[in-house]
């Protein structure tokens, strides 16, 4: 019998959580015999909404209308799947599942732990998020009873990574780059993505060379005002370095790009490598997309991106240019009440190491150095495409929603009891 499942999330927004909500939706739709899907769309900050007219978008619109009518008639749900940050989780159905990107720092907020504990289970996008949620513990004293209070995670937390995306035809981009070698970085402007340091390290290392850095970014939306603000911010970083007679170039790439256009960017003949030194990632989707598209990656080996930048063997084997880093406190201006708490830390890429790894990647590509990460990037892309296939990730996600493993364990226990009786 089909389960009525309500998906709550920013499914129509161009955001990380929007991408996450659409992955959840596609996973549920891959098993039409198991679920009757309903959708409650959320906004996500000031991010833009999807504007493409696709069969999926039309189906989402129809399902939202169906959901409104169903709720107005008093309809109930067997399962709610809530794609958002944990402090927004609610009791909406007989069974409630939280699906969150988790945390990009060393500690989860106590509000998050408390909210996760109200869920029947929680799904996260990376082992980093799982580990932080499970290891964050708090204690205090009850103001009324003076008794010590302990708070830690008590709910089941499981990981499902994102799948690779494949396209039959990718558009040709007219990037108009006049530098011979080009790095790419894809990052929203803000403290966490560490974009200013990325630009600074690039210019200081390649200031007198014919090398470019393509910066795909925005602040929140894809408007002209947003573009002008991004342009001014980048110019401010460049001007602060006081580099005269600079030959290297920084290109601003701004505006709405479809999935096909983004993947065309990763494989464009003018793009040679991906550089990303964020302070922390729940998963690091642009880094993942670049890696499975065959781009060499320069990054830090901490937080969500570790799930695909390293092998799962022990000890983990890196498949990227590792930038050294230090874990230090999150600055005051990046704290977010109920989300990023004061005692948390995140990674700070060492600037000299960033320059060294960018240089090493540059040299490996220019000199065709054997056994380098750069020359093995396409081989690694093939491995990722197999390990993170759409079919596997959809299946893993559906199994967690349906408690397939728990059901299998019960069935095995019943079979064991029957065998004992016989």
Segments (PLM) and residue ranges:
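Donor nucleotide-sugar binding/catalytic pocket of nucleotide-sugar-dependent glycosyltransferases
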Residues: 121-169
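Conserved donor-binding/catalytic core segment of Leloir-type glycosyltransferases
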Residues: 6-9, 176-193, 199-202, 213-215
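A charged, aromatic-enriched C-terminal amphipathic alpha-helix characteristic of glycosyltransferases
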Residues: 345-356, 366-399
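C-terminal alpha-helical cap of glycosyltransferases
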Residues: 359-367, 390-422
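Nucleotide-activated donor-binding/catalytic signature segment of Leloir-type glycosyltransferases, i.e.
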Residues: 224-265, 272-273
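Extended catalytic core of nucleotide-activated donor transferases of GT-like folds
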Residues: 6-8, 46-132
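N-terminal pre-catalytic "stem/leader" segment of glycosyltransferase-like enzymes
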Residues: 1-76, 212, 395, 422
């Amino acid at each position: 019998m089909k389960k009525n499942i309500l998906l709550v999330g920013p499914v129509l927004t161009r955001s990380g959580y929007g991408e996450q909500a659409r992955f959840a939706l596609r996973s549920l739709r891959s098993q039409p015999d198991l679920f009757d899907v309903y959708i409650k769309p959320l906004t996500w900050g000031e991010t833009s909404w999807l504007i493409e007219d696709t069969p999926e978008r039309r189906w989402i619109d129809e399902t939202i209308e169906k959901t409104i009518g169903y709720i107005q008639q008093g309809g109930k749900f067997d399962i709610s799947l809530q794609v958002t940050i944990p402090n927004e989780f609610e009791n909406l159905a007989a069974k409630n599942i939280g699906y969150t990107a988790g945390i990009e720092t060393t500690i989860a907020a106590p509000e998050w732990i408390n909210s996760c504990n109200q869920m029947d289970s929680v799904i996260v996008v990376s082992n980093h998020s799982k580990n932080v949620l499970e290891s964050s513990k708090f204690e205090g004293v009850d103001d009324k009873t003076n008794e010590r209070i302990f708070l830690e995670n008590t709910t089941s937390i499981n990981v499902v990574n994102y799948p690779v995306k494949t396209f039959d035809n990718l558009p040709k981009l007219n990037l108009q780059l006049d530098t011979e070698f080009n790095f790419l970085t894809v990052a929203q402007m803000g403290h966490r993505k560490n974009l200013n340091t990325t630009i600074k390290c690039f210019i200081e290392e390649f200031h007198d060379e014919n090398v470019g850095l393509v910066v795909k970014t925005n602040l929140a939306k894809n408007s002209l005002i947003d573009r002008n603000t991004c342009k001014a911010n980048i110019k401010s970083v460049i001007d602060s370095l006081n580099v005269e007679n600079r030959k290297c170039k920084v290109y601003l790439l701004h505006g709405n790009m479809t999935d096909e256009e983004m993947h065309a960017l990763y494989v464009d003949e003018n793009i040679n490598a991906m550089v990303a030194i964020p302070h922390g990632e729940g998963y690091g989707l642009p880094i993942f997309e670049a890696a499975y598209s065959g781009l060499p990656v320069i990054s830090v080996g901490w937080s969500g991106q570790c799930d695909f930048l390293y092998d799962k063997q022990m000890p983990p084997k890196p498949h990227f240019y590792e930038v050294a880093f230090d874990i230090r406190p999150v600055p005051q201006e990046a704290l977010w009440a109920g989300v990023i708490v004061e005692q948390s830390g995140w990674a700070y890429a060492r600037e000299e190491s960033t320059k060294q790894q960018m240089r090493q990647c540059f040299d490996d590509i220019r000199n065709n150095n054997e056994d380098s990460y750069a020359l093995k990037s396409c081989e690694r892309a093939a491995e990722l495409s197999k390990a993170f296939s759409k079919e596997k990730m959809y299946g893993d996600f559906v199994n967690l929603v349906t408690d397939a493993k728990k059901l299998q364990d019960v069935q095995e226990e019943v079979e064991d009891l029957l065998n004992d009786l016989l």
